[in-house]
Amino acid sequence: MNGIKFSANYENNPAMRRVVNPFYSYLRYKSFIMSYPENLRYTKDHEWISLDGAIATIGITDFAQRELGDIVYVEVETIGKHLEAGAVFGTVEAVKTVSDLFLPVSGTINELNPALANSPELINNDPYGAGWMVKMKVDSSADVDDLLDAAGYEAVTG
């Protein structure tokens, strides 16, 4: 195999090759670490959105929080404001950088996750659960369908 000498057990046992193969291990590691929930939609700017009727919950993806590092502060000053899709609705501050947060769809932001005021690390620990950022009333639920599904977002993040 490619000029590398392997033990007879490895050569003759396909199951063993799958377990030991570094590329296979990387794929298993990546799929375990970087899984994207199928029930959410995603943006190329690394936000996720979950829709329940006309109310959407929005946060940043696992990929985004890993790239940012330890999150120390979230600022959203757009509560009660109507914003268009793509508008900046706040910022997230990590130890190494500050990043804008972009609204995936048009609507009015109703609520900021109150737990983030004292525990912004929830975004790092549970980005798709307790680490949600805002809830909003969307103008059109059809806009959500135009966003990326999990497979599309995974293709963006490589």
Residue spans for each PLM region:
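Intrinsic disorder/low-complexity signal
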Residues: 2, 9-10, 23, 37, ...
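Short, low-complexity, charge-dense intrinsically disordered segments
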Residues: 1-31
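Short, intrinsically disordered low-complexity segments
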Residues: 16-17, 27, 40, 65, ...
